[in-house]
UniProtKB/Swiss-Prot annotation:
Annotated GTP binding sites: 407-414, 453-457, 507-510
CDD domains tied to this protein: IF2_eIF5B, IF2_mtIF2_II, mtIF2_IVc
Region entry Disordered, spans: 65-84, 91-310
UniProt protein name: Translation initiation factor IF-2
Biased composition (Basic residues): 262-276
Species in which this protein is naturally found: Pectobacterium carotovorum subsp. carotovorum (strain PC1)
Region (G1): 407-414
Length: 899
């Protein structure tokens, strides 16, 4: 016969291929869909399937449901009906002749074993009964014998006593009486000893019999245990030998036993309901009561059940406490309720709620008061361990100086640096001003110098402060024609705060109006004294445009660096500071890091503030890929988990997992401090909030190209807030304007400001659909000016009252329609109808209202000019007298602006 494949066989017998392959596998044959199947394999598979099917064909399971209604009493004396459904399952197994014969033999053996055990037990019980009867009989005989002996002895003693008494009564003397008393005492003593001996003899006999009975009982108990331990007598006999059938039979037995117990409980319930409360014991009555209540009552625990007793001795635990902990967390650490902790704190004089954060000292006092051992843990322990586990070199070498160029706006800082680097960076800056820190290192004939160019605008104070902290020497650029300006003074203050030496570059020396001596004089007023005047600062006259004095400036910088003896460890793990950071759409978070010590290599794990990551790529200031950077070298690194804050310390660590833990800890700590600062309510703030009126808010979503610019703009916008209009920055960040930013602006009714960034397509769609205000800027001046205009539009307008006319009342006429009409002469200005007026009497305002009627002769007119007569009717006022003055004015709205 031709072989067929598994797939064709499955199609022939109309079964899935996967199922047929599984059946082959169950039969012990591994097949795939394309394998051939022989006739022998078909027969093997068929036999396997028939064998499996045969196991199940002899088994029949029947289910039966019976429903009944039970009336049970409930609260209030009422009864309610409960539907009870009883489900019964019976399984019947068909036995084959072999199994039936084997089961019959097993049943016969079991019955014989039971009969034999029963006969042995009956014989043993009979022997024990005989022994007990013999022991009791012997005990009774001994008791009777002792009683008889005691009675006979007592009779003999009485007879002898009577005989002696009779003999002595005939002739009794005093010595005879004494002898008689002595004998009577001896007789009583003998009687007592005899009774004691008889009692001891009876007790000894009883003990011997009891010991014999106990020994026989122990022997019988051991023999019964040995017989019960035999497997053929203790095994659970089944009707069939099939494993599945036995399981079904056991399940059936369990259900039958459960039904028997259910019937027993139901019978008890019925008896309870009918009033028959003659239960066997108190436990039965409690069980019946629990069933009657529908299971809600608690059943008395049986004497055989174990019960857990609460330990009396208090458990002392080791409680680990951090710098801050809530009352609930402290209670969990001590395994007590929060209310107990609050009670202890109240006893110690501290009031707290369960969610209140308490400090480490308070938590320590509470835990020790409750008898626990306190282990204080520092929160930054992991951070200190990570920072200490670093490879740092030991040999310090000379390094290049880090020079920061500072000065006022447009004094030529970037142009000076451009000339040194022979590039034109200022042309790429919007408006010709530097918007963020630029870090560059240049090679000179005398050595390498790293320059940091800081913005000069007042808004970038924080950036300038960070630049001073990361620098060794400050080059203060002052224009010779402009002199000392506000940002120049600020730069001097930053340099002094950082204790950094200052080299003054007097720029624009080629201009005709240049006055270097004036610059020296002005700087000397702020503590920057030139060397020729006995000071410590070097003054160099330069021209960034013509290139004059550039070499002298570099020599002065290198000379100052030699005096400082700048050294750094070149080997080992790197340590640096983030100069600037931003989010690049294609490369992700980018951070400009100035290496302070060690060597930063590609692939190092860097921990930087709240962020961490592995350095995936490094570039220098010209955009070239590099693999390592030594001290005083600024580099751009990629691979951080987020955009770090400018000014954060960047440290290379060993373990990325620990770096992640430290970064997450810092984030959580910052969040806790921020929330605590927000939730802290001071008394003066409460009064200020109570007294301040309605304040308008200008919501802003700010996105910038770099972190430093974002911080500077945010700070400047916050300073624009007034008592009436406040600037609220609902969202800020680094990178392009995304759909999330637009959604946030729409939800908070904010305007979107983009500084050197643009919105993507999805964000523009939301801006158009929601009609949001989206504005782009490249110069900070324009941004601040337009925000001021927007805030000015939100200010409440001011109103000014301007007097436009004055009329003198000459006479008063009565009108049936308007009441008192004042006949007036316009002495100044113009009188207009429906304007506000004031009535003055003796130059005192006695009424302020509205001009209702204005007539000239009998005609209604809208206005009457100076030198003309008219009739004026004042609305809702009739007390007009001759000689009064009527002052006509109008209210003018004055638009306010923010200075």
């Amino acid at each position: 016969m031709t072989d067929v494949t598994v797939k064709s066989l499955a199609a022939e017998i109309q079964t899935p291929v996967d199922r047929l392959i599984q059946q082959f596998a169950d039969a012990g044959m591994t097949k795939s869909a394309s394998d051939a199947v022989t006739q022998h394999e078909k027969e093997t598979l068929l036999a396997h399937l028939n064998r499996d099917r045969g196991n199940a064909q002899g088994k029949l399971t029947l289910q039966r449901k019976t429903r009944s209604t039970l009336n049970v009493p409930s609260t209030g004396g009422k009864s309610k009906s409960v539907q009870i459904e009883v489900r019964k399952t019976r399984t019947y197994v068909k036995r084959d002749p072999i199994d039936a014969q084997q089961a019959e033999e097993e049943e016969q053996a079991r019955r014989e074993a039971e009969e034999q055990a029963q006969r042995a037990a009956e014989e043993q019980a009979k022997r024990e009964a005989e022994l007990r009867e013999a022991a009791e009989k012997a005990k009774r005989a001994a008791d009777e014998q002792a009683k008889r002996e005691a009675a006979e002895k007592a009779k003999r003693d009485v007879a002898e006593k009577e005989k002696v008494t009779n003999q002595q009564n005939e002739n009794m003397t005093k010595p005879a009486q004494a002898e008689k008393a002595k004998r009577e005492a001896e007789a009583a003593e003998l009687k007592r000893k005899a009774e004691e001996a008889a009692r001891l003899k009876v007790e000894e006999e009883a003990r011997r019999i009891a010991e014999e009975a106990r020994r026989m009982a122990e022997e019988n108990a051991g023999r019964w245990e040995a017989e019960s331990a035999k497997p053929e007598e203790s095994a659970d006999y089944h009707v069939t030998t099939s494993h599945h059938a036995r399981e079904a039979e056991d399940e059936n037995d369990r259900q039958v036993e459960g039904e028997r117990r259910s019937r027993s409980r139901a019978g008890k319930v019925t008896k309870q309901k009918k009033g028959n409360r003659q239960s066997e014991s108190k436990a039965d009555r409690e069980e019946a009561r629990a069933v009657t209540r529908g299971g809600k009552g608690k059943r008395k625990p049986s004497s055989l059940q174990q019960s857990f007793n609460k330990p009396v001795q208090a458990v002392n635990r080791d409680v680990v406490i951090g710098e801050t902990v809530t009352v609930a967390e402290l209670a969990n650490k001590m395994a007590v309720k929060g209310s107990q902790v609050i009670k202890v704190m109240m006893k110690l004089g501290a009031m707290a709620t369960i969610n209140q954060v308490i400090d480490q000292e308070t938590a320590q006092l509470v835990a020790e008061e409750m008898g626990h051992k306190v282990i204080l843990r520092r929160e930054n322990e992991l951070e200190e361990a990570v920072m200490s586990d670093r490879d740092t070199g030991v040999a310090a070498e000379a390094r290049a100086p880090v020079v920061t160029i500072m000065g006022h706006v447009d004094h030529g800082k970037t142009s000076l640096l451009d000339y040194i680097r022979s590039t034109k960076v200022a042309a790429g800056e919007a408006g010709g001003i530097t918007q963020h820190i630029g870090a560059y290192h240049v090679e000179t004939d005398n050595g390498m110098i790293t320059f940091l160019d800081t913005p000069g605008h007042a808004a970038f104070t924080a950036m300038r402060a960070r630049g001073a902290q990361a620098t060794d020497i400050v080059v203060l650029v002052v224009a010779a024609d402009d002199g000392v300006m506000p940002q120049t003074i600020e730069a001097i203050q930053h340099a002094k705060a950082a204790q950094v030496p200052v080299v003054v570059a007097v720029n624009k020396i080629d201009k005709p109006e240049a006055d270097p001596d004036r610059v020296k004089t002005e700087l000397s007023q702020y503590g920057v004294m030139p060397e020729e005047w006995g000071g410590e600062s070097q003054f160099v006259h330069v021209s960034a445009k013509a290139g004059t004095g550039i070499d002298e400036l570099l020599d002065a910088i290198l000379l100052q660096a030699e005096v400082l003896e700048l050294k750094a460890v070149r080997s080992g793990m790197a340590n640096g500071v983030v100069i600037e950071s931003f989010l690049d759409k294609g490369r992700g978070p980018v951070a400009t890091v100035l290496v302070r010590e060690g060597t930063l290599n590609k692939g190092d794990i860097v921990l930087c503030g709240f962020e961490y990551g592995r350095v995936r790529a490094m570039r220098d200031e010209l955009g070239r890929e590099i693999t390592s950077a030594g001290p005083s070298i600024p580099v751009e690194i990629l691979g951080m988990s987020g955009v770090p804050a400018a000014g954060d310390e960047a440290t290379v660590v060993r373990d990325e997992k620990k770096a992640r833990e430290v970064a997450l800890y810092r984030q959580g700590k910052f969040r806790e401090v921020k929330l605590a600062r927000q939730q802290k309510s001071k008394l003066e703030n409460m009064f200020a909030n109570m007294t301040e009126g309605e304040v308008s808010e200008l919501n802003i979503v700010l996105k910038s190209d770099v972190q430093g610019s974002c911080e500077a703009i945010s700070d400047s916008l916050q300073k624009l807030s007034t008592d009436e209009v406040k600037v609220k920055i609902v969202g800020s960040g680094v990178g392009g304007i995304t759909e999330t930013d637009a959604t946030l602006a729409a939800a908070s009714n904010a305007i979107i400001l983009g500084f050197n960034v643009r919105a993507d397509a999805s964000a523009r769609r939301i801006v158009e659909s929601e009609s949001l205000d989206l504005r782009y800027y490249s110069v900070i001046y324009d941004l601040l000016d337009e925000v001021k205009q927007a805030m000015s539009g939100m200010l409440a307008p001011e109103y000014k009252q301007e007097i436009i006319g004055l009329a003198e009342v000459r006479d008063v006429f009565k009108s049936p329609k308007f009441g008192a009409i004042a006949g007036c002469m316009v002495t100044e200005g113009i009188v207009k109808r429906h304007n506000k007026i004031r009535v003055l009497r003796d130059n005192v305002v006695i009424y302020e209202g509205e001009l209702e009627s204005l007539r000239r002769f009998k005609d209604d007119v809208n206005e009457v000019r100076n030198g003309m007569e008219c009739g004026i009717g004042v609305k809702n006022y009739n007390d007009v007298r001759p000689g009064d003055m009527i002052e006509v004015f109008e209210t003018i709205e004055i638009k306010r602006t923010i200075a």
